[in-house]
Swiss-Prot record:
GO BP, sorted A to Z: spermidine biosynthetic process
Subunit (UniProt): Heterotetramer of two alpha and two beta chains arranged as a dimer of alpha/beta heterodimers.
Classification via Gene3D superfamilies: S-adenosylmethionine decarboxylase (3.60.90.10)
Family per similarity comment: Belongs to the prokaryotic AdoMetDC family. Type 1 subfamily.
UniProt keyword annotation of Lyase present: yes
GO cellular component: cytosol
Post-translational modification comment from the UniProt entry: Is synthesized initially as an inactive proenzyme. Formation of the active enzyme involves a self-maturation process in which the active site pyruvoyl group is generated from an internal serine residue via an autocatalytic post-translational modification. Two non-identical subunits are generated from the proenzyme in this reaction, and the pyruvate is formed at the N-terminus of the alpha chain, which is derived from the carboxyl end of the proenzyme.
Catalytic residues, chain numbering: S64 (schiff-base intermediate with substrate), H69 (proton acceptor), C84 (proton donor)
Note on how the cofactor is bound: Binds 1 pyruvoyl group covalently per subunit.
Source organism phylogeny: Archaea, Methanobacteriati, Thermoplasmatota, Thermoplasmata, Thermoplasmatales
Enzyme Commission number(s) of this protein: 4.1.1.50
The encoding gene: speH
Catalytic activity: S-adenosyl-L-methionine + H(+) = S-adenosyl 3-(methylsulfanyl)propylamine + CO2
Protein name: S-adenosylmethionine decarboxylase proenzyme
Source organism: Thermoplasma acidophilum (strain ATCC 25905 / DSM 1728 / JCM 9062 / NBRC 15155 / AMRC-C165)
Keyword list, A-Z: Autocatalytic cleavage, Decarboxylase, Lyase, Polyamine biosynthesis, Pyruvate, S-adenosyl-L-methionine, Schiff base, Spermidine biosynthesis, Zymogen
Length: 131
């Protein structure tokens, strides 16, 4: 049985409008909107503007975090969405970002974090019994 503590979505968005991702001013409402749409609990956030263009940001969530980095010169946005609890929250936040950023292609990995908890616990019990 697979047991996990959270869902981690790692994604690269290609072909995104360079003007849309060039500044924190443009990215801020999109990222904050994803947090709201995903019904995530924001603790704090921080954004950084690169010169002449490009942006990075992270939202600390009660459920974990959402972070991004942009490369407008390549039309690239890299995303990290990690949530504990209901996996639908990560999926909803991700879907919101796809809708708002409109990439022409996406590379995605979805990982169940802590999926070996039971297995690790069993191994520890077996090893303790041998000593």
């Amino acid at each position: 049985m697979e047991v996990g503590v959270g869902i981690h979505i790692i994604a690269d968005f290609y072909g995104v409008d360079s003007e849309l991702i060039a500044t924190t001013e443009r990215m801020y409402p999109i990222i904050e909107g994803a947090v709201e749409y995903g019904r995530l609990t924001k603790i704090s956030s921080d954004y950084y503007q690169f010169r002449p263009k490009g942006a990075s940001g992270i939202v600390l969530l009660a459920e974990s975090h959402l972070s991004f980095h942009t490369w407008p010169e390549y039309g690239l946005v890299t995303l990290d969405i990690y949530t504990c609890g209901d996996p639908k929250t990560a999926d909803d936040a991700f879907a919101y970002l796809v809708d708002k950023l409109r990439p022409t292609s996406i590379s995605t990995r979805k990982i169940v974090r802590g999926d070996m908890i039971e297995e690790a616990g069993e191994n520890q019990i077996e090893e303790a019994a041998l000593h």
